[in-house]
Amino acid sequence: MIKIENWSTEDIEKYSRLIGEAFAASPGIAETIPHDDLVKSFEIITEFYYRMGTLYTTSEKYEGFLAYWDKNTRQPLGPALHMIRRMLREIPLLNIATGSSEQYKKLYRKEKDYIAVSMVVVLQAYQGQGFMKKVLELPFAEAAKRGCPCILDTDNIQKVVKYEHCGMTKTAEKKMAHDITLYTMAYLPTSA
């Protein structure tokens, strides 16, 4: 895995759009938000993670991406405000509210540490080739090194199965609006 640094504005636009398109093609919350709004929201979120310094990719071919951080990572104010301004300016408020929730923070708040993972995605051209496991290697290794869980939320039951195949277990599920279920997944290294 490679930490993404020194992207041009064009790179950010290109890959954030591809990430948004990959999420838009998945079931779950994606089915309840207009396609263009969903793609735009992932463009904004990708830029946020890039500015935050938490965006990683599988290789220089950019097959898959994720953002991860530990429990004590503080979000820099500048990138967070930039993201909020863009969301409010570019996406209808109702669609922002529909897609936002972090169940894992509530469930794992008593843990001394954890590795939080977000935006796990394999671009459409590379799906079905085993890249999901490769995308998760780095945060799993970090969790094992620290002896803490690696956690994430997903609204996609198909991804639950894929995450389980990669070594995660489902630790919670919560019914949300629009018949969506939010699943919390955890990788628990043997030393955690």
Language-model region placement:
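Conserved acetyl-CoA-binding loop-helix of GNAT-fold acetyltransferases
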Residues: 122, 128-141
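Conserved active-site alpha-helix within GNAT-family acetyltransferase domains
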Residues: 133, 145-147, 156-173, 177
